[in-house]
Amino acid sequence: MIGITLAFVLWVVGSVVVTVLIYDATFARYEREEKPVPAALEPLVADRRAVTFSSGDNTLAGYVYGDGGDMLVVMAPGYHACVDDYLWQIQHFLDSGYGVFVFDTTGSCHSEGESAVGFSQAVWDLDSALTFAEKSGLFGYRRVALFGHSRGGYAVCCALAAHEVAAVISVAGVNSAMEGVMEPAAARVGFVAYGNYPFLWLYQAWLFDAETVSLSAADCIAQSDTPVLIVHGKNDDAVELDGGSIYAHRAEIDAPQVDFLVWDTPQQDGHSDLLFDADGTENEALMTYICQFLEQNSKGK
């Protein structure tokens, strides 16, 4: 009996250690060399306004594009993504009459933070960004809409629980923090990954809190009356369409103001390539669809 108990204790301790080591390595700080800005986007970069704001103990770096007007689009970037990864999408929003506020998340690129912490950190960072924007008078804009990609697509839906916004666009969004971590783990090691599920949940609850880790994008959408557009690539191999995506939980969202769009254009139906055309510019058709959704469905027009 003592041997069984000892073996169990050793298994628990070993599982906790392995979980923490792998998790912390996965969400290590992300930095990279600056990419050259395409000549067509140099005026966009030259005219943007740099801002900083606090998220917890860290100072985050962001940019405001535009000088005021009707609607500000606050963008939440994906995991291992920086502000400049979305310059073509930002330009499209500006050309369509919207302002944009976007930022580097904790532990990424130009923002402070020793690590990216986890999926839930995107929720906290976006909450801090929205609070900062609200206290700044939305930088001269009347309304705010949200656009998020990947981890950011999860965060913008969770923001519905705490902020009044005109509309939400989620692209390639994961449904929950646990699904965001478990899906790639299971893809690598199979069903055995679920043996560490309780330790992973407890570690994230310790890093954040149980309420935040338990947030589900589908639940937040279902409890809101805000228009939401969920976009997902048919062949997304990072957040699978019928796996941990928000789209996979569509049956839990019984709301007429929510639209679902599966993007199936070849070579543009993955996790990130759905945002771009073959020449590296924005996916013109998708961005036009998104802007039309904002024009036709947003609250407070």
Walk through the language-model features, giving the residues of each:
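Alpha/beta-hydrolase active-site loop
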Residues: 116-137
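C-terminal catalytic histidine-bearing segment of alpha/beta-hydrolase fold enzymes
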Residues: 255-301
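An N-terminal hydrophobic leader/cap segment in hydrolases
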Residues: 2-54, 61-63
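Short beta-strand/loop motif that positions the catalytic acidic residue
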Residues: 224, 230-232, 236
